[in-house]
A protein has these predicted regions:
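Beta-rich carbohydrate-recognition and catalytic domains
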Residues: 1-20, 26-189
Length: 189
């Protein structure tokens, strides 16, 4: 799916579209585009023989797609853990860059916010004061022109050794597209 805002593609992500029955919904936050024209362009996988003759117009997912100001994230899934951390929706993998700063533990993890399987790799983010109760935060690092976000690590730079500011959280990670590159991101807030 390509997200197009005012005739410009701003995001691209892979989604498993429900053909006959919708098993789950995936939210896409449009609030940052308030007042702008947003459209979605679907490209079906032509190599999949099941989908060759289908279009978004005759699929269950598009018939049930809707705008909403809220998204129910109540954990109703039979196999989703209740004691160990898991995201509100989507798929997660290995934790990356766990740090402690100002009385809070920060957990970063590989995350697909658009499906229940591997893909669309972002770094999810959650914080906790006790490592049991977690507050979900917005995606920390999202794919860009260099690719999706793979494994890495993070540190708190208490002494400003990197020059980004004392106490900055610095993440170093692999990005993947047609080749892999090493990237760095930092936050001072």
């Amino acid at each position: 799916i390509s997200m197009i805002v005012n005739n410009k593609e701003v995001k691209n992500f892979d989604v498993r579209l429900a053909i006959h029955k919708v098993d789950y919904f995936v939210p896409v936050d449009l609030s940052v585009f308030s007042g702008k024209t947003v459209s979605f362009k679907f490209k079906m996988n032509s190599n999949d023989p099941i989908r060759v003759n289908l279009s978004p117009d005759n699929t269950a997912c598009c018939k049930e797609m809707k705008l909403s100001d809220t998204f129910d994230t109540t954990n109703r899934e039979k196999f989703r853990p209740t004691y160990h951390f898991s995201p509100l929706y989507g798929w997660m993998n290995d934790p990356n860059g766990m740090v402690y700063k100002d009385g809070e533990y920060h957990l970063f993890y590989q995350y697909n916010p658009y499906g229940s399987k591997w893909g669309n790799m972002n770094w999810g983010h959650a914080i906790s004061k006790d490592l049991v109760n977690w507050e979900h935060r917005p995606v920390a690092i999202a794919p860009d022109a260099l690719g999706t976000i793979f494994s890495g690590s993070a540190v708190v730079d208490h002494n400003n050794t990197a020059g980004f500011g004392a106490g900055a959280i610095i993440a170093i990670y692999t990005q993947n597209s047609d080749r892999q590159v090493q990237s760095i991101a930092y936050s001072t807030d």
